[in-house]
Amino acid sequence: MANYYRKRVSPIKPGDPIDYKDVELLKKYITERGKIMPRRITGLTSKQQRDLTKSIKRARLVALLPYVNKES
């Protein structure tokens, strides 16, 4: 029987590190209001999502990313 479900492919390769200093990468996974996108939307693996969340929170702590984006 054929497999009807497409295998999900993570947008970030599993071996690639997620670094808190890579602000351009982190901004892709934050909403316009500044919230971290959930895993079902990002398509990351659970380990990558945990690493991404840690990196975003660390980047916010050292003021590389804002906690909340102001609405215009």
Curated annotation (Swiss-Prot):
SUPFAM superfamilies: Ribosomal protein S18. It comes from the Bacteria. PROSITE patterns: RIBOSOMAL_S18. GO terms for cellular component: cytosolic small ribosomal subunit. Keywords: Ribonucleoprotein, Ribosomal protein, RNA-binding, rRNA-binding. GO terms for molecular function: small ribosomal subunit rRNA binding; structural constituent of ribosome. InterPro entries: Ribosomal_bS18, Ribosomal_bS18_CS, Ribosomal_bS18_sf. Signal peptide: none annotated. The keyword RNA-binding applies. GO terms for biological process: translation. It holds the Pfam family Ribosomal_S18. Belongs to the bacterial ribosomal protein bS18 family. Part of the 30S ribosomal subunit. Forms a tight heterodimer with protein bS6. Binds as a heterodimer with protein bS6 to the central domain of the 16S rRNA, where it helps stabilize the platform of the 30S subunit. This is Small ribosomal subunit protein bS18. It comes from Trichodesmium erythraeum (strain IMS101). The lineage of its organism: Bacteria, Bacillati, Cyanobacteriota, Cyanophyceae, Oscillatoriophycideae.
